[in-house]
C-alpha cells in the first residue's frame, strides 16, 4: 500500500553534487521583499558613503584631520556595501553560497576586517572629539594631519592582519575540527571559530566601545559646562570682543560635531550589540542559534554601514550642501573645490 501523502522534495544547493548543503528557500513574496530590503541597504551604504568620501576629498574647506578620519570610516563602510553585503544578501535569502570556497574565505575576511576597521575609526574619532572639546586651544597642535594618518593606518592594518590570521591560518578552528567538518558542505559559507577567538572578537568590540562610552560621557559633561560658561559670559558682557565671539562659535561648532558623532557611536553600538552577544553565546552552547536569528543580527550590523551618511545628512548642513553640489554637477566646474560649505 502506498501513501497518498508525499513528503516535499528536499532541495539542495547543488543538485548533482555529493555533500551539497540543504537549501531552504523563501517563498516568492518574502523573497522579493528581502531582496529589496537588503539591496536597498547595500545601495545606500555604497552611494551614501561614496558621497561622504567625495565631499571630504574634493572640498578644501573640509580638509581637516577629523574629516579625514570620517572619510576613511566612510571608505570602510563603502567597502562593506560593495564587497560584503551583496554576496551576503544572496547567501541569506537563497540559504546557499554560490561563489566558491576561495571567495568564501575572502568574503569572510573582508567582512570582519572592514567592520572592525569601522569600530577602530569610531574609537579614534572619539579621541579626536575629546581633545577638540576639552582642550580646544591646543587641539590643532595635538591632532594634526600626521596624527590622523597614523590613526587611519592603525584602523586599517590591525583589522586586516587579524582577519587574515583568523581565516587563512586555520588557528581559529583549532579544537573544533570535528564540528567544522560536520558543518562543512558544498554551497555553505559559515563562520565557525573556537571559544578563544570568539572571546577575542568580543574584546575587539567591547574595548573600543568602552573607550567611546567613557570619552563621550566626559565630552558631554565638559560641553555642558562650556555652554553654561558661554551663556554667563555673554549675559555679563554684551560688548564682547570679536575674538571672544569667534571662540564661542568655534566651541559651539565643536560641541555640535561631538554630539553628531556621539549619535554615530550609539548607532554603531545598537547595530552591533545583538550580533556580538549572539556570537559570544553561540560559541559556548554549540552553535544552536536559529538561522533566522543569526541573519537578523548579521544584517543589523551590516545596516550600520548605511546609517552613518544618513546621520551626517540629518545633522550636518555642510554635508547636505555638498551633496547638492555633487549631484547637480557643480563640482565639475573650475574652483568648485574652494566653495564655502559653512554658513558662518
Swiss-Prot record:
Entry's Gene Ontology molecular function annotations: trace-amine receptor activity
Keyword tags: Cell membrane, Disulfide bond, G-protein coupled receptor, Glycoprotein, Membrane, Receptor, Transducer, Transmembrane, Transmembrane helix
Topology feature Cytoplasmic, residues: 53-67, 133-146, 217-260, 304-344
Transmembrane intervals: 32-52, 68-88, 112-132, 147-167, 196-216, 261-281, 283-303
Pfam families: 7tm_1
Membrane topology term: Multi-pass membrane protein
Expression sites by tissue: Specifically expressed in neurons of the olfactory epithelium.
Cystines in this chain: 21-185, 104-189
SMART domains found in the cross-reference section: 7TM_GPCR_Srsx
InterPro entries per UniProt: GPCR_Rhodpsn, GPCR_Rhodpsn_7TM, TAAR, TAAR_fam
Consequences of knocking out this gene: Mice lacking Taar2, Taar3, Taar4, Taar5, Taar6, Taar7a, Taar7b, Taar7d, Taar7e, Taar7f, Taar8a, Taar8b, Taar8c and Taar9 show no visible phenotype or behavioral deficits. They however show an absence of aversion to low concentrations of amines such as 2-phenylethylamine, isopentylamine, N-methylpiperidine and cadaverine.
Position of the signal peptide: none
Subcellular compartments: Cell membrane
Parts of the chain on the Extracellular side: 1-31, 89-111, 168-195, 282
GO cellular component: plasma membrane
Glycosylation sites: 4, 18
Summary of the function given for this chain in its UniProt record: Olfactory receptor specific for trace amines. Trace amine compounds are enriched in animal body fluids and act on trace amine-associated receptors (TAARs) to elicit both intraspecific and interspecific innate behaviors. Ligand-binding causes a conformation change that triggers signaling via G alpha proteins, possibly G(i)/G(o) G alpha proteins.
Family note: Belongs to the G-protein coupled receptor 1 family.
Protein's UniProt name: Trace amine-associated receptor 8b
Natural source organism: Mus musculus (Mouse)
